[in-house]
């Protein structure tokens, strides 16, 4: 994927690049008040939702085109760049006409290739930064596919926004981070800037600060944070928005670590990791060899491949062993689920010969 820098004039290259503003543009006064407070804290890029794709009808679905005039006024009054979400070709045309500086594609839209293609077609011949949120479901290929569609339309100033993934289980997060997915995105497209959206991942303002720090520790390039002049009275997502003062406090507390060249001591530790990985692979190979022998025995004696009782016993015992060794039981469960799946696959090959 051929990419160019998304940075606009006057935006520093140091991490994090911050995009901040309310979830929704509600009134002209609210938009301007929030923008002026953020600008006073040194923020350069303003965000506000003009069209809001709500899960169910009846909620506030955005102020619409009227709000674009307010964003134009933000640019004029504060000098900030302005950004908003687009979900249709009509949104794109209205934003371009209003001089919006940065566009982003929302999670629900990213999940629909037809909608993404419509947006990509509307952007042909335009040079504007476009950020693409991850789809609501944890599908990396769908996320990359959306980026590729827009890139194929000729846009090179692209970035990704990690806002977490929808889950029925909302014990801690509104949307599960599943950090391994944006990490894999970074591995696949190393020069793609990645922003973290702690507001949508956490769903609660008290989670914004730790999520911002975690994103920085994972070498994310930027943050897109919902900030409102009066969060408790917000018309949408009130619980996850913070005031400009609180946002400034959070940003000032961030510890920004750098990627440095490996020192000799770090190189030695990594060598130990490599040796451990080699040992793991060798031991897994031995385990699969025994699993194949078991598969042969099952075939000869007419025994089914899947033995549910034995499988449950393995998961319980290995989970407990892992906890005793300082590892998370859920982590152990995932590992042995994957090992069991491969064992079953190899035994099925023997059974079906």
Give residue spans per PLM region:
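Catalytic beta/alpha-barrel core
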Residues: 63, 79-92, 101-116, 128-140, ...
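Glycine-rich, proline-tolerant flexible connector loops at the mouths of alpha/beta enzymes
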Residues: 47-66, 229-238, 294-305
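Long, contiguous binding/interaction regions
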Residues: 35, 39, 44, 63-81
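Domain-level signature for soluble enzymes in the chorismate/prephenate branch of the shikimate pathway
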Residues: 259-353
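N-terminal amphipathic alpha-helix/helix-capping segment at the start of soluble metabolic enzymes
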Residues: 1-19, 73
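Catalytic alpha/beta core domains of metabolic enzymes, predominantly
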Residues: 11, 115-249, 253, 261-264
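Hydrophobic faces of well-ordered beta-strands that scaffold small-molecule active sites
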Residues: 16-22, 44-48, 82-84, 103-105, ...
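Active-site mouth loops of central-metabolism enzymes
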Residues: 16-33, 57-61, 80-86, 106-107, ...
């Amino acid at each position: 994927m051929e990419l160019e820098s998304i940075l606009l004039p006057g935006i520093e290259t140091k991490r994090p690049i911050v995009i901040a503003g309310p979830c929704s543009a509600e009134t002209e006064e609210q938009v301007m008040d929030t923008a002026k407070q953020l600008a006073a804290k040194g923020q350069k890029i303003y965000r506000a939702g003009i069209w809001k794709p709500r899960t169910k009808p009846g909620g506030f679905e955005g102020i619409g085109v009227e709000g674009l005039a307010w964003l134009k006024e933000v640019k004029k009054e504060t000098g900030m760049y302005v950004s908003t979400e687009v979900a249709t070709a009509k949104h794109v045309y209205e934003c371009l006409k209003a001089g919006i500086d940065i566009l982003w594609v929302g999670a629900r839209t990213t999940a629909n290739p037809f909608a993404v293609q419509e947006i990509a077609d509307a952007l042909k011949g335009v040079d504007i930064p476009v950020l693409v949120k991850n789809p609501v479901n944890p599908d990396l290929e769908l996320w990359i596919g959306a980026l590729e569609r827009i890139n194929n339309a000729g846009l090179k100033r692209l970035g990704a926004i990690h806002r977490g993934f929808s889950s029925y289980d909302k014990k801690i997060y509104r949307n599960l981070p599943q950090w391994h997915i944006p990490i894999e995105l970074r591995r696949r497209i190393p020069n793609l800037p990645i922003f973290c959206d702690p507001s949508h991942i956490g769903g609660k303002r008290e989670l914004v600060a730790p999520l911002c720090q975690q994103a920085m520790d994972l070498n994310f390039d930027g943050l897109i944070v919902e900030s409102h002049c009066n969060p408790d009275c917000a018309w949408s997502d009130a619980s996850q928005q913070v005031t400009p003062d609180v946002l400034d406090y959070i940003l000032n507390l961030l510890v920004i670590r750098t990627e440095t060249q490996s020192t000799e001591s770090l190189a030695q530790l990594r060598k130990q990791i490599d040796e451990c990985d080699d040992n793991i692979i060798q031991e897994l190979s031995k385990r699969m060899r025994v699993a194949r022998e078991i598969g042969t025995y099952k075939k000869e004696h007419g025994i089914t491949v899947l033995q549910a009782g034995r499988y449950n016993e393995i998961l319980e015992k290995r989970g407990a062993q892992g906890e005793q060794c300082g590892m998370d039981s859920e982590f152990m469960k995932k590992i042995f689920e994957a090992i069991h799946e491969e064992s079953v696959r190899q035994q099925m090959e023997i059974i079906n010969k």
